[in-house]
């Protein structure tokens, strides 16, 4: 029995609250159960130096956790003077995932920065960040079109992510913290809305997993992501 009584393939309740802050071109509070992340999308004219003159845009991301997002307080990374390896890995993942959602040539020479700040962590903060940031990105791109700065919306489709894993020998979808900390296998999967894979991060924490178990986990992830994408689209229609 899972902690919340969920079935193996069931994601936690997902809520996407748009326009959560007033200054950013796109802002979303995303909630996966008790995991809560504030995602904002900020537009700047111009691109990084390595892209200048190429007629395409860029999407980048930053990720962080509030000190008391977790069970015990973690000092701000700014106070330590440097970002941790986990933070850098996650923000690169978010940026890669969201670049797959956009035609960068159609975006033109704009840079969109996605800031994902974890308010409360209960497992799956990176997958929640990708899911919420995609909706914030969609709102920001819609504003570029509405303001006449772009003729065509460069959004190719939604992107979402979910964690899957093996806990006590059972493959399950969307792990909360107590499950994640006990997982024999832990995996994060990012997909497009039509089920194509953008990224898979999978690790055997204990017993190695088989090829068949990998396919089972990917199928679980696809089902979970289909449900999450439906929630994303419903949020954008409201």
From Swiss-Prot:
What's the Enzyme Commission number for this chain?
A: 2.7.7.56
Q: Which Pfam families does this entry report, sorted A to Z?
A: RNase_PH (PF01138), RNase_PH_C (PF03725)
Q: Where does phosphate bind?
A: 86, 124-126
Q: Which GO terms describe its biological process?
A: rRNA catabolic process; rRNA processing; tRNA processing
Instruction: Name the CDD domains on file.
Output: RNase_PH_bact
Keyword vocabulary terms for this entry: Nucleotidyltransferase, RNA-binding, rRNA processing, Transferase, tRNA processing, tRNA-binding
Q: Please give the superkingdom of this protein's source.
A: Bacteria
GO molecular function terms noted in the UniProt entry: 3'-5'-RNA exonuclease activity; RNA binding; tRNA binding; tRNA nucleotidyltransferase activity
Instruction: Quickly give the catalysed reaction.
Output: tRNA(n+1) + phosphate = tRNA(n) + a ribonucleoside 5'-diphosphate
EC main group: transferase
Q: Does the keyword Iron apply?
A: no
Summary of subunit composition and partner proteins: Homohexameric ring arranged as a trimer of dimers.
Q: Which HAMAP family match?
A: RNase_PH (MF_00564)
Entry's family note: Belongs to the RNase PH family.
Known PANTHER family for this protein?
EXOSOME COMPLEX COMPONENT, EXOSOME COMPLEX COMPONENT RRP41
Q: Give a short account of what the protein does.
A: Phosphorolytic exoribonuclease that removes nucleotide residues following the -CCA terminus of tRNA and adds nucleotides to the ends of RNA molecules by using nucleoside diphosphates as substrates.
The protein here is known as Ribonuclease PH
User: What is the native source organism of this protein?
Assistant: Salmonella typhimurium (strain LT2 / SGSC1412 / ATCC 700720)
